């Protein structure tokens, strides 16, 4: 999704305080809503370290700021939160990450209906850093290739916050 976002919707994090975090969320929501994104099925995506920071964040009275982030189905601003290590947490200074907000109704996954299958008895492969010959080992190698693609119907339907240092 990172590279499908409109340039105007890719912004740098405001900082690490609770107010900065709120501003990050506000910026992302404003980016989508100001672009007339329908917000039919919006969702947040973040690295586990960022989620764990939010679930433990407290105000000056000791109250949880985001209690809805706790539990099996975390929510943020009434939208579901999906956690993945596919979002790096070693960017920028080495501990920065990114945060995504996208209207998933505009996400499209394409999948080719054919599956390419090849068999070859003369191919080679690497096993434990040693080149192995299927021919000399009396083996047949089989390869299956499925084709997939992902796109957003509208670039404005994705907002990315970069340089996210909170929770590092």
Residues covered by each model-derived region:
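Alpha-helical scaffold segments that mediate packing/assembly in large oligomeric complexes
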Residues: 1-34, 76-77, 82, 160, ...
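Sequence/fold signature of self-assembling virion shell proteins
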Residues: 58-168
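Long, contiguous amphipathic alpha-helices that act as assembly "spine/axial" helices in icosahedral shell
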Residues: 1-9, 33-49, 81, 131-154
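Extended alpha-helical or coil "stalk/linker/tether" regions that are enriched in polar/charged
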Residues: 13, 19-71, 91-95
């Amino acid at each position: 999704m990172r590279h499908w976002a409109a340039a105007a919707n890719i912004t740098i994090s405001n900082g690490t305080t609770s107010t900065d975090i709120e501003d990050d969320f506000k910026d992302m929501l404003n980016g989508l809503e100001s672009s007339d994104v329908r917000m039919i099925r919006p969702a947040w995506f973040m690295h586990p370290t960022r989620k764990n920071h939010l679930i433990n964040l407290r105000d000056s009275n000791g109250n949880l700021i985001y209690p809805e982030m706790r539990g099996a189905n975390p929510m943020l601003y009434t939208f579901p939160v999906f956690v993945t290590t596919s979002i790096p947490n070693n960017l920028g200074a080495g501990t920065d990450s990114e945060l995504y907000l996208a209207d998933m109704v505009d996400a499209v996954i394409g999948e080719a209906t054919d599956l390419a299958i090849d068999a070859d008895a003369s191919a080679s492969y690497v096993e434990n850093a040693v080149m192995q010959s299927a021919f000399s080992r009396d083996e047949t190698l089989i390869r299956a290739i499925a084709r997939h693609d992902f796109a957003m119907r509208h670039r404005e339907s994705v907002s990315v916050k970069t340089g996210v240092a909170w929770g590092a």
